[in-house]
């Protein structure tokens, strides 16, 4: 290898020095032109989006569409090369067609119009829905072009890289639920639009043009292995296996298709598992009366019916008892004597109180001899026989039972003004049960023992 002499070193310079050629300067000029063209394109596209959002006049829209974006030949060449590389990766890479027909596709059409008036593909085709699964970047351009597109839009989160596939957040002017996510068994041809949609017509030439280039499919099929592994951010929208999913479109969302094709906003067509859960509690935590389960309602209704039935039964018993006449027990010998001699005692004495009259009759009864009392005992025996013939099934316990029931029916809060008679410790006689007549202490103790009277009787 020939060696250079020391004299020529000053002319050539150091060995590690970089020598610039004319081609490198031309490349820098091309890069500057490309960056300026991309900035102009982003400005034009943002103005188009703003005009479409504010629904301005058709004249302003047509002027914005007729405005030609400055583009260079080198940028078009780069976009074509990137499209060819993406098509090759899609044919031989991860996202191949399904191995068997009928496997559901996930189809994500463009959020806005992906084509400019001159028929070229706009950078919005590279934006994706805000989801957490990896999608194939169709236009895998250089890192510089993606960075300029990101800077032209509103600030968005950093790229989420999963298996070296970038996922970019969509711009702020598009609603996250705008794209149409459907599962279908039909295959869509890459170059032909759906039959129910009108063809896109060029405003300048009037010739219909296809919405997508023929070499790129507008829908991205997912392989069977990746569908089950992708976590869906909208959990209640993910269908279960074997169940169809309906389009998610409402009138309030932006959609690139005519409004006549939008689906009604009501969720009546959704399966039950897709409807989001609703809160059934008030702010206080008490369930709404219309949301009470049928079992609770049945139990409450059964308890109400049982209580009504028991109350009706008790009312019927009370009515029957009222209808039955009160049967008095047969008079004994002393009662027969009192019945006969009461008028004579009242005529002889000036006392008008029954208690004093009863005391006088009692003294006279005990003063009678056995033979005189035997007459009244015989009358009492005949009275009992007659009573047994008239009321064969009668017993004195029937009347006592009624009195007990009356005591039970009384409420514990009820009080009587003669209650002090029961609490008087000086009383040696049994308590008085009949409280309807006043002045019981006077009849019991008499006027001589007023110190034993209760409070109400002493008044």
Swiss-Prot record:
Bias-annotated ranges (Gly residues): 1-11
Chain residue ranges for the region called Mediates interaction with MAD2L2: 178-372
Gene3D superfamilies assigned to the protein according to its UniProt record, in alphabetical order: High mobility group box domain, TCF3-CBD (Catenin binding domain)
Cross-link Glycyl lysine isopeptide (Lys-Gly) (interchain with G-Cter in SUMO2): residue positions: 22
Region (Disordered) location: 1-96, 295-327, 397-418
Phosphothreonine found at: 178, 189
Alphabetical list of InterPro entries matching this protein: Catenin-bd_sf (IPR027397), CTNNB1-bd_N (IPR013558), HMG_box_dom (IPR009071), HMG_box_dom_sf (IPR036910), TCF/LEF (IPR024940)
Residues in cross-link Glycyl lysine isopeptide (Lys-Gly) (interchain with G-Cter in SUMO): 297
Region listing for CTNNB1-binding, in residue ranges: 1-53
Major location category of this protein: nucleus
Secretion signal, residue range per the UniProt entry: none
CDD domains: HMG-box_TCF7-like
Any one Gene Ontology BP term: negative regulation of organ growth
Tissues expressing this chain: Detected in adult brain and liver, and at lower levels in intestine, with a clear increase from the distal colon to the duodenum. Detected at low levels in heart, lung, kidney, pituitary and testis.
Motif (Nuclear localization signal): 402-408
Protein keywords: Activator, DNA-binding, Isopeptide bond, Nucleus, Phosphoprotein, Repressor, Transcription, Transcription regulation, Ubl conjugation, Wnt signaling pathway
Biased composition (Polar residues): 47-56, 295-305
Segments of the chain annotated as binding DNA: 327-395
GO molecular function terms listed in the Swiss-Prot or TrEMBL record: beta-catenin binding; chromatin binding; RNA polymerase II cis-regulatory region sequence-specific DNA binding; sequence-specific DNA binding; transcription cis-regulatory region binding
Places the protein is found: Nucleus, PML body; Nucleus
Annotated Basic and acidic residues bias: 19-43, 63-91, 312-323
Pathological condition linked to this protein in its record: Constitutive activation and subsequent transactivation of target genes may lead to the maintenance of stem-cell characteristics (cycling and longevity) in cells that should normally undergo terminal differentiation and constitute the primary transforming event in colorectal cancer (CRC).
Family per similarity comment: Belongs to the TCF/LEF family.
Assembly mode: Interacts with TGFB1I1. Interacts with SPIN1. Interacts with CTNNB1 (via the armadillo repeat); forms stable transcription complex. Interacts with EP300. Interacts with NLK. Interacts with CCDC85B (probably through the HMG box); prevents interaction with CTNNB1. Interacts with TNIK. Interacts with MAD2L2; prevents TCF7L2/TCF4 binding to promZIPK/DAPK3oters, negatively modulating its transcriptional activity. Interacts with ZIPK/DAPK3. Interacts with XIAP/BIRC4 and TLE3. Interacts with DDIT3/CHOP. The CTNNB1 and TCF7L2/TCF4 complex interacts with PML (isoform PML-4).
Function (record text): Participates in the Wnt signaling pathway and modulates MYC expression by binding to its promoter in a sequence-specific manner. Acts as a repressor in the absence of CTNNB1, and as activator in its presence. Activates transcription from promoters with several copies of the Tcf motif CCTTTGATC in the presence of CTNNB1. TLE1, TLE2, TLE3 and TLE4 repress transactivation mediated by TCF7L2/TCF4 and CTNNB1. Expression of dominant-negative mutants results in cell-cycle arrest in G1. Necessary for the maintenance of the epithelial stem-cell compartment of the small intestine.
Protein name: Transcription factor 7-like 2
Record organism: Mus musculus
Gene this chain is encoded by: Tcf7l2
């Amino acid at each position: 290898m020939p060696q250079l002499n020391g004299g020529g070193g000053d002319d050539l310079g150091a060995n590690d020095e970089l020598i610039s050629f004319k081609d490198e300067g031309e490349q820098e000029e091309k890069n500057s032109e490309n960056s300026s063209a991309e900035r102009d394109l982003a400005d034009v596209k943002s103005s188009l989006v703003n005009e479409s959002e504010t629904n301005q006049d058709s004249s302003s829209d047509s002027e914005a569409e007729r405005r030609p974006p400055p583009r260079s030949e080198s940028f078009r060449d780069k976009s074509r090369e990137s499209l060819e590389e993406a098509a090759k990766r899609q044919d031989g890479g991860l996202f191949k067609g399904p191995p068997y027909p009928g496997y559901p596709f996930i189809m994500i059409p463009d959020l806005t119009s992906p084509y400019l008036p001159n028929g070229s593909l706009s950078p919005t085709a590279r934006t994706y829905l805000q989801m957490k699964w990896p999608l194939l970047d169709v236009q895998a351009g250089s890192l510089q072009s993606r960075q300029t597109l990101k800077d032209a839009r509103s600030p968005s989160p950093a790229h989420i890289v999963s298996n070296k596939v970038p996922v970019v957040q969509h711009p702020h002017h598009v609603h996250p639920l705008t794209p149409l996510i459907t599962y279908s068994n039909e295959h869509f041809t890459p170059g032909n639009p759906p039959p129910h949609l009108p063809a896109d017509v060029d405003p300048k030439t009037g010739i219909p043009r296809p919405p997508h280039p023929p070499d790129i499919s507008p829908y991205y099929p997912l392989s069977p292995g990746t569908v089950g592994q992708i976590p869906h951010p909208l959990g209640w929208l993910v269908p279960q296996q074997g169940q169809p999913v309906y389009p998610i479109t409402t009138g309030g969302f932006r959609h690139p298709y005519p409004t006549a094709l939008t689906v009604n906003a009501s969720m009546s067509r959704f399966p039950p598992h897709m409807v989001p859960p609703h809160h059934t509690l008030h702010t206080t935590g008490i369930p709404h009366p219309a949301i009470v389960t049928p079992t609770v309602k049945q139990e409450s209704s059964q308890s109400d019916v049982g209580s009504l039935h028991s109350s009706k039964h008790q009312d019927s018993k009370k009515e029957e008892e009222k209808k039955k006449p009160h049967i008095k027990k047969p008079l004994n010998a002393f009662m027969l004597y009192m019945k006969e001699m009461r008028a004579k005692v009242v005529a002889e004495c000036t006392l008008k109180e029954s208690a004093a009259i009863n005391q006088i009759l009692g003294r006279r009864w005990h003063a009678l001899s056995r033979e005189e009392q035997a007459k009244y005992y015989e009358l009492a025996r005949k009275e009992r026989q007659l009573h047994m013939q008239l009321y064969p099934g009668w017993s004195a316990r029937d009347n006592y039972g009624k009195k007990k029931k009356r005591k039970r029916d009384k409420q514990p809060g009820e009080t009587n003004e003669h209650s002090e008679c029961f609490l008087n410790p000086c009383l040696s006689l049994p308590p008085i049960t009949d409280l309807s007549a006043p002045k019981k202490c006077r009849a019991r103790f008499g006027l001589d023992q007023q110190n034993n009277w209760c409070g109400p009787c002493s008044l």
